[in-house]
């Protein structure tokens, strides 16, 4: 067991500044109108730094810097951009523990998750896209003996990126790595709930990039996010967050006819077929962990398996075992490596989760585990902690339909394969899903029949850089991860060349 020291305390791996500025043009720049807001840690609820409350004037400054850098960066050789991305990955890797502590203090997640997933995945994404851009090739088509079509990949230019509060550092990597690899410059706006860890990241890697290639502007959605997304000076906007905000982002972008990538909400089904209990072996244990994945990152994951569908033949036995597994989840100090469940990212989010607990009760759903705010004592009592909660009910309830974004799972049963698929697809969303079966044919069929962009089969919550991620239905537009993501940040130019000396003969 290791308990990391809190930022700024004796023996700490990192310290936060008491006041941050925006990162624009390779420099730390104060907000134009001199406004700041307090940023509390969800671990204790106490403020620990101030962050710029930026507005359109600051966005314009960042766009000036990004446009100044765009021509030079866009013309660098792919190998040069790849080398810089690899240096960023190395710098993150070297400071992994410090970045994990920074992320915990800003977001509230347990440090074991940040060390095992968030930071290594950020490294993985920079390294992957460094390799992908070097491997990307154009295309040549011979139209006839004298005519050739060349296809080139060219950067879009300046892109706007708005990231959520559930994985601040990782989401910055998801957005920045492909955009930079493709030769774009970026203006990034972190979520106002978790602005500090991305600023700490920039303090570590900012010197590796030419000035203006990456610019970070903080602030609230209406004051900074809207001016960025609606600007006619960006060539694309990429957004991760809730579906309602995604609709607004799409409206803003539509006025300028620019492309969008949207990764939005989810209400992911996690299906357990009867054969998972054919034996009480490693596979069964893995499936029970798969059920409990609804509590990973405090349920603050767009693909949270927040609907569990258990085949009726094993419903009672499996649910009993799953409840035991869930009740064994350890809550405590997020900086303790033994802690499995940290705090919600904000008090507002905690209150939202608690409101859905009441909604579930009013609908007649039954709580079989959790259901209350977690009281941890000491100075953690001011933090935003929630017990992992299991409801049982029916798929027509609001807790089955609406995204809660907390450690809450709604459980129901199904009779057969068709019933399972029907329940799974009875949702507005289609971001993720899980399928658990020892039968390969069943697992494959279910994976194909579920209407979701990412279906985990006999696993859950794996996010490798080289696997495409994105949603069906109201869960978004476009994909992240995988080399295909490069094309979301590129124009395709066709150069159609005739090598014939002869006229076409029309006139």
Curated annotation (Swiss-Prot):
What's in the keyword line of the UniProt record? Acetylation, NAD, Oxidoreductase
Gene Ontology MF terms in the entry: aldehyde dehydrogenase (NAD+) activity
EC no.?
1.2.1.3
Supply the InterPro entries for this chain: Ald_DH/histidinol_DH, Ald_DH_C, Ald_DH_CS_CYS, Ald_DH_CS_GLU, Ald_DH_N, Aldehyde_DH_dom
Could you list the residue ranges that cross the membrane? Answer: none
Q: Name one Pfam family in it.
A: Aldedh
Domain of life, source organism: Bacteria
Q: Which GO terms describe its biological process?
A: symbiont-mediated perturbation of host innate immune response
The entry marks the following residues as binding NAD(+), namely 219-225
Query: Which reaction is this enzyme known to catalyze?
Result: an aldehyde + NAD(+) + H2O = a carboxylate + NADH + 2 H(+)
Query: Which range is the signal sequence, renumbered to this chain?
Result: none
Q: Where is the active site?
A: 263, 302
User: Where is the PTM N-acetylthreonine found along the chain?
Assistant: 2
Task: Give GO cellular component annotations, separated by semicolons.
Answer: plasma membrane
What family does the Swiss-Prot or TrEMBL record give for this protein?
Belongs to the aldehyde dehydrogenase family.
Q: What is this protein called?
A: Probable aldehyde dehydrogenase
Q: Which organism is it from?
A: Mycobacterium tuberculosis (strain ATCC 25618 / H37Rv)
């Amino acid at each position: 067991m290791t308990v990391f020291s809190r930022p700024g305390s004796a023996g700490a791996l990192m310290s936060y500044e008491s006041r941050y500025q925006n990162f624009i043009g390779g420099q730390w720049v104060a907000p134009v109108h001199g406004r700041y807001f307090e940023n509390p840690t969800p671990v204790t609820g106490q403020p620990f730094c101030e962050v710029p409350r930026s507005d359109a004037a600051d966005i314009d400054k960042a766009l000036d810097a990004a446009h100044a850098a765009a021509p030079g960066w866009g013309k660098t050789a792919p190998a040069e951009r790849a080398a810089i991305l690899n240096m960023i990955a190395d710098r993150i890797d070297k400071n992994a523990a410090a970045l994990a502590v920074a992320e915990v203090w800003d977001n509230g997640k347990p440090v074991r998750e940040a060390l095992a997933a968030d930071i290594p995945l950020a490294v993985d994404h920079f390294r992957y896209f460094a390799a992908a851009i070097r491997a990307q090739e154009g295309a040549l088509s011979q139209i006839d003996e004298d005519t050739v079509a060349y296809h080139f990949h060219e950067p879009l230019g300046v892109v706007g990126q708005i990231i959520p509060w559930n994985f601040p550092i990782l989401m910055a990597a998801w957005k920045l790595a492909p955009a930079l690899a493709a030769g774009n410059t970026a203006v990034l706006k972190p979520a106002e709930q978790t602005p500090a860890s991305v600023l700490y990241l920039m303090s570590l890697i900012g010197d590796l990039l030419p000035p203006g290639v990456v610019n970070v502007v903080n602030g609230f959605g209406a004051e900074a996010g809207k001016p960025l997304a609606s600007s006619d000076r960006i060539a694309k906007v990429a957004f991760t967050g809730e579906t309602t905000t995604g609709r607004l982002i799409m409206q803003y972008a539509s006025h300028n006819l620019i492309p969008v990538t949207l990764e939005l909400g989810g209400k992911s089904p996690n299906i357990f077929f009867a054969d998972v209990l054919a034996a009480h072996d490693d596979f069964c244990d893995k499936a029970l962990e798969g059920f409990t994945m609804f509590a990973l990152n405090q349920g603050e994951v767009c693909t949270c398996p927040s609907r569990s569908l258990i085949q009726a033949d094993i419903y009672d036995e499996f649910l009993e075992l799953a409840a035991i597994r869930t009740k064994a989840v350890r809550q405590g100090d997020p900086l303790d490596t033994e802690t499995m469940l940290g705090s919600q990212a904000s008090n507002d989010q905690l209150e939202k989760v608690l409101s859905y607990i009441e909604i579930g009760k009013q609908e007649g759903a039954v709580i079989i585990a959790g259901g209350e705010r977690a009281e941890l004592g000491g100075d953690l009592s001011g933090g935003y902690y929630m017990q992992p909660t299991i409801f049982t009910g029916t798929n027509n309830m609001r807790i089955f339909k609406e995204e809660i974004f907390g450690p809450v799972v709604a459980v129901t049963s199904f009779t057969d394969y068709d019933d399972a698929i029907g329940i799974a697809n009875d949702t507005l969303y289609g971001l993720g899903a899980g399928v658990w079966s020892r039968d390969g044919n069943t697992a494959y069929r279910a994976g194909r029949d579920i209407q979701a962009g990412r279906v985990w089969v006999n696993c859950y919550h794996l996010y490798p850089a080289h696997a495409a991620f994105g949603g069906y239905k109201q869960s978004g537009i476009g994909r992240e991860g995988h080399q295909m993501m490069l094309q979301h940040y590129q124009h395709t130019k066709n150069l159609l060349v005739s090598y014939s000396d002869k006229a076409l003969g029309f006139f």
